[in-house]
Amino acid sequence: MAAKKLVYGDEARAKLKAGVDKLANAVKVTLGPRGREVILEKKWGSPVVTKDGVSVAKEIELTDPYENMAAQLVKEVASKTADVAGDGTTTATVLTQAIYEEGLKAIASGANPIYVKRGIDEAVKIIVEELKKISKPVTGRKEIEQVATISANNDPEIGKIIADAMEKVGKDGVITVEESKSAETVLEVTEGMQFDRGYLSPYFVTNAEKMEAVLENPYILIYEKKVGNIRELLPVLEKVVQTNKPLLIIAEDVEGEALATLVVNHIKGVLRVCAVKAPGFGERRKAMLQDIAILTGGTAITEDLGIKLESVDLDMLGKADKVVVDKDNTTIIGGKGNPEDIKARIEQIKKQIETTTSEYDKEKLQERLAKLAGGVAIIKVGAATEAELKEKKDRVDDAVHATKAAVEEGIVPGGGIAIFRASRALCNIKEENTDKAWGIKIVKNACKVPLKQIAYNAGFEGSVIIEKIKDVDNVNYGFDAATGEYVDMVEAGIIDPTKVVRTALQNAASIAGTMLTAECLVAEIKEKEEKLPGAGGGMGDMDF
């Protein structure tokens, strides 16, 4: 086991602060409509120019191990916020830095870190409740377009395309982002279905960069039971191999020698195959398998049909134009089912929704309806250069996630205004414990920082702006950093998804609070690599 080195107390906190500052200072320059670009060096290919906070954060590794610990924790804030809400990564990073910096001042003045953290957590809960009160539901296309435009770094073209996509597939439909072969960014809508089951083995992956298994024109075997014995599968595998087409297996599970054999044959290139677990459970699983069968024109091989796996023919298998499987989801695009059968199935599910009394059943039926009727929208992103394409694709990805978040939890005024207004609720809190009160004050002050940073990046003084807007009763009243004017943010179309703002604050407070309670840092002492002596002359290439 490698030897460790340790630092304690103030020295540890100083190291953490240095790490937080290095990462946050690189990320926060991208915040707001006039945020700056960051250029990232790549080992292969051209450098990437980006204004996406999480892309910048992911690239940062620091040489000092203690500083790097802090940087990795802040990176986690950005990544987690991006995963959950799709946007707000820079805001989350800025808030983490602000909460940690203010918290260190409290600790240096003798406050108990545990009580300070409790105060921070209490304040965050109050602000989240306040955000819910400020939040408004998304009612029309205009708001969807505004959210998408802002999340795509104020690009109205992307905003319009995403609004079109949401309109065509609905809020429950699937929107994927791909690279276009031309310089144009276009929207394609394809009938399709997605369910939340990923590949059973990463060895099925065909695109290592995206960690996806992509099957073009595959056959689809839909089986209700587990597959453990490869002999059961062999007849259908042999038939599929003769057609030279890939195969997607959807079953309760594929395990043991059956899975091992599929993996080996896939790696050797004998058969392009991918196995996934069937979606749902119990009777609902049977219904979902039937949905997939109708969509793809196949037969769901269920126990009550009395068909054995060995006797399955090619005409019982479903077909599709394309199947994309990642570690969490399977998307079937262009199912070759009979349109009349699909329509009849949709009507059947609609009738079930009308007659069911259970809210849970209704929700699950609506999910199935969306999967059958929604389809898949593909946004093909185009640009003049590879560097611009990568940057634009990142922005479109962000905007799609943020738009879905807006539909889910509603919208609040943007530009850092919502969190600033919500923090006013903390003024009414009377906390007897002085250390907890300090924690509440820390969050109140931190909530001003995103607004200040947006203004600073646009060349304005944030403190002056806060003084001008703080006493105005209209919660939507704020500062448009793009034009330098004071406006009603919602009317001006400057809005953020509530989920983005909420997630950014919760994640920032969680990590910053955790770092404040740290008293000791432990890192490995790196051993010096000894240079190996050169090989003997004349015999260097010989094996013995």
Curated annotation (Swiss-Prot):
GO terms for molecular function: ATP binding; ATP-dependent protein folding chaperone; isomerase activity; unfolded protein binding. GO terms for biological process: protein refolding. It catalyses: ATP + H2O + a folded polypeptide = ADP + phosphate + an unfolded polypeptide. Keywords: ATP-binding, Chaperone, Cytoplasm, Isomerase, Nucleotide-binding. ATP binds at residues 30-33, 51, 87-91, 415, 480-482, 496. Gene3D superfamilies: GroEL (3.50.7.10), GroEL-like equatorial domain (1.10.560.10), TCP-1-like chaperonin intermediate domain (3.30.260.10). Its EC number is 5.6.1.7. This is Chaperonin GroEL. The lineage of its organism: Bacteria, Pseudomonadati, Aquificota, Aquificia, Aquificales.
